[in-house]
Structures are given as C-alpha cells and as structure tokens.
Amino acid sequence: MNHIISHKKLTIDHVRTIMSEGMKLELGKEAEAAIVKCRKFLDTKMEDIGRPVYGVTTGFGSLCNITIPAEDLSQLQHNLVMSHACGTGETVRPEIVKLMLLLKIQSLSYGYSGVQLVTVQRLIDMFNNDILPVVYQQGSLGASGDLAPLAHMCLPLIGLGEVLYNGEVRHASELWEELDWEPVRLQSKEGLALLNGTQFMSAHAVWSLIQAERLSDWADQIGAMSLEAYDGRIEPFYPQVHEVRAHKGQIDTAARFRELLEGSEIIRQKKVHVQDPYSFRCIPQVHGASKDTIRYVKSVIETEINSATDNPTVFPDEDLIISAGNFHGQPIAIPMDMLTLALSELANISERRIYKLISGQRGLPNFLVAKPGLNSGFMIPQYTAASIVSQSKGLCMPASADSIPSSQGQEDHVSMGANAATKLVRVVENTERVLAIELFNAAQALEFRRPLRSSWTIEKIFAHYRKSVPFIEDDTYMHPLIEKSVKFIR
C-alpha cells in the first residue's frame, strides 16, 4: 500500500503507520500540479523581473546584495548545497533521516517552493528504496532552517555525498551509476528550497513524539506494577480527587491506573500505612503533566509538518515572491525543550520509585534479594538509573534560550532548535532505560507479595516479562538483564 503525497493533513499517527509498515510514497495529482505550477511561475518571473530576488538571483545570508548573472543561477544552487554540507559529529539515526526525506517531500509538495518535479521525485525514489543520506547531528542553528544537515541530505541529489543502502555506506555517485540514475541539475532557487526548512528539527520531534507516547503508556503500566509491589494505596487515584483539579492528563492517568489495577488482590488488602510517598501518591499529577505536554507538542509539530518552511516563499496565484522567515525554528524549538522536560520528569519520578522498592520498606527485603550483604541484589541498577536521570536533568537546559548571531550579523537571532532536537532524542533514550530498570525492580519486588495476585492486566505484563527476565535469587550479571528489559518495552 502506498501513501499518496497530497495536501491532506499529515498526522503523526499516520507518519507512524508509514514508517512502521514500510509504506512507499507516491506523488498525488494535486501535489504534482502545485509543484509544476509554482516552478513554471518562477521560470516565467525570472524572464521579466526587474529586481533582485533573494536566493534566486542573489547570494545568500549576508551576501544577499550580490546579484548573480542568469547564466550562473544553476551553479549558484549547486554551490550552495556543496558549501553548506558542513555537518560533523555522530550520524543521525537512519529512521530519522528517512523521516527528514518524508517531511521535506511533504513541504515541497504544497507548491510554494519553486522546485522542479524531478527533484521531488528523486527524493521520493530515495525514500522508497531506503537510500538514506548520511547526515550529521551537529551543524544546524535552527535558522535559516537546518542548513547543514539538509545540505547533507540533498548532496546525493546532485551525485555527491554518502548514503546508507542495504546496511552499507556508499558514495552516492557510485550507487547512482549502478541504478542508472542521473544527478539532478538544480535550477534557480532549488538549492535554497532544499536547504531552507525545519525538517531536521521536525523529524527528530516526530520520532521523539512517537517514542514519547509509547514511553508515557509504559510509565503508567510500570508505575502501576511498582505501586502494587510497594503495597501502595488506590485512594489517590479516585476520580473525585481529580475532578476538582481537572487537568486532562491528570484525570486520564488516574483513570488508567484504576483500569490497570482493577481486580487486584494486593490493592484491596488492608493497608497499615496511612499514605504513600509522593513518587507513588502524585503519579497522576506528574505523569499527567507529561501527558498534557506531549499532547500540546504533538499539536504544534503536526502544524509544522504540514507547512512550507523554506525561503523565499513563492505565491503563483498572487504573483508574489516574498523573502521572510518561515525557516525559523523557534515555534518548534520551545516545544521540543518542553518535551525534553516532560520525558525527563517521567524518568525522574521513576527513579524515585526504584529507590523506594530497594529500601527495605513495607516487607520488602533490602535491595530485593535474599541474603543481603552476601548479595548486593538490586543496589546498583538504582545507581545506574540515578546517573541517567542526572544526565537528563542537565539536558533540560533549554536550547531555545540561546542564540548566536551568524552570517556577519544578517542572521542575528537563531532558534538553536537543532540542539533542542538532538538532546531530546538523548532524553528519550535515557527515559526508556530508566523505565526499563524500574520494570526490572518492580517485577522482582512483586514476587515478594505472593501468594497475593495483582490485577489480570499487571499479571499478564509480569508473565510476559518473565519469559525474558527471570527472578533473581542470588547475585548475577545484571547488564544483559537490563538490556533485555529495555528491549521488552521497545
């Protein structure tokens, strides 16, 4: 089944389906007509326009006042892509690069960018054949768009750069020859249309949101298992509490916990303690705040991936070519920083629950193991979780609060959204690991509540998990078990 590139709203849920099912892309007639119309308008306009047009007949950045002769316009765009491919550092995950291709294709399809049809089609060919450009994590200021990473993404279009194909990094020129593909000869404005845009930031945000929704759900399931293992109380999850402070995420979290724990023998037994620590009692408020943030950020990013974000913007129907600032990443940089904080907090409260489970309280043995002293048990997994959480807290410093002028002061305010994007991915990875460690601890602790049973739902998760990770009788090599726990929730 193919996904048709059109002007219909592209949702993150559908992007998840495109990626998970390996769908191919096909350019719809509406999008094709818009691309052709805009390119034709631009070509006609260039024949009789009497003024410089930024990035079309001029240099770039602070070189915007230098007019380029008509015979050099194609070379100008070629030079732009080559010269701006200055990324460095670690390479971007292949799945995020593939998202970059999808989102760039979508943005160009609206017909406000002035690109050739053949250019968009080649991007589609690369997506459909899993030919993924090698892109680097460092180099973008998040305005004028994601110049360096998008340059690396687009180098293969002109037969340059490297691509990942069938698990092997290849020179694009060699692969193009094997496939009998000709490099695209860029026309006026095309290089700028390809490089100006927020697709590096947006792709990271989309990938992170998909993971965030998964991790938020796991945080509830694992938190519910921990609550059972700690012999916690259900009263803080009663609906009456949350109806008088009606944040949607809080209400949803409390309802989810009531559902997860329905029928539990452990939750129904008489409790000796009057109340639970905040890391259990305030789960609806904390997990709920993260849910609300995820929901908000998702709405912002969905707006972004359905937008034209290059510059200048071409309006054929209005006979306008306008140099403006849709490439600026601030509208998504701030939400990405928010999402980083929301995910970090899921890990933060998770680590506190881990700590409580190993503390020798409420009938649980010290460090959840027999013969403590001879055995260290689950002592060090908590250290690992604490280390990860501390790193994530450091990464919560908002990248979007910073700006460094560039291009001789012409580009004097930037979003640093690309830095927000890459550290967001790191916090996603960190949160996944902390939740996996909590599951490792919670499952161990739950065994000490036997013969009482938890709810059907929690017991089902527990039984499935036990197929991968066993109960720990005595000290053993923990690292493989933590990795299996990560894989389990992935």
Features from the language model and the residues they span:
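FAD-binding glycine-rich core of flavoenzymes that anchor FAD
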Residues: Y112-Q138
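Conserved, non-catalytic sequence blocks in retroelement Pol enzymes and Pol-derived host proteins
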Residues: Y112, L141-A143, G373
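FAD-binding core of FAD-dependent oxidoreductases
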Residues: Y54-I68, D72-L76, S83-L108, Y136-I158, ...
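Cysteine-centered functional microenvironments
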Residues: V135-S140, D317-I321
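Alpha/propeptide regions of enzymes that mature by internal proteolysis
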Residues: T91, G111-Q116, D217, N306
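C-terminal auxiliary extensions adjacent to catalytic cores
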Residues: N2-M23, L27-A34, C38-F41, M46-I49, ...
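Generic N-terminal targeting/processing segments that precede catalytic cores or assembly contacts
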Residues: H7-L99, V118, D125, L209, ...
